[in-house]
Amino acid sequence: VLGEDSTPGTAEFDLFIKEVQKEMTVKAGQKCTAVRRIIVPEKLVDDVQIALGQRLSKTIIGDPQIEGVNMGSLAGNEQKEEVTEKVNQLSKTQEIVFGSLEDFEVTGADKNKGAFFSPILFLNNDPFNNKDCHNIEAFGPVSTIIPYNNISEAIELARMGKGSLVCSIVTNDMKAAEEFVRGAASMHGRILVLNEACAKESTGHGSPMPLLTHGGPGRAGGGEEMG
């Protein structure tokens, strides 16, 4: 979640773009803590789309043994077929604004034989009615930009995942951060508050650290919250 105060030119905006790009592409997005929903202020949607697209465009897909390659393949062709199917399902209710299922380059490997996949960025302009992005998970480098108009909407959208392992809010407004955490916490295993002051010490959005909760309510766990 991008805070309303985290506008282009702030350290927090840059942190947000960097963190989202990292969580989309590390292990080709095949992580249970990867960012699937990018919740941003409606007024900043265009800025986020442009900045994130520019950063994702630097992704070099291919054989990880080759210098310069920074994203490898999916686990296998079966996984590629599954992610492709999920992307096609998501495409029915939202628009791809970066990436392609076919038009991308692969370095040092055969694109047609390997399970390579381009980062795919969606935009969902009506996330309260077009709910696929909350219910369909493409387990690869796939994520959706979702606009909100106020912190209450951001909380509601975050909770529409019906249980998530981890959520982050990137803001320097501690009042807004507190309101978000109080409202969204019961649907998340953990929530990271990230800003310039703590960035150098932060392990990041998706780090599975021994002392952090790695599980959660609803879809994020096996019912541990129910005893």
What are these regions (language model features)?
Residues 1-128, 152, 156, 184:
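ALDH superfamily catalytic-core signature
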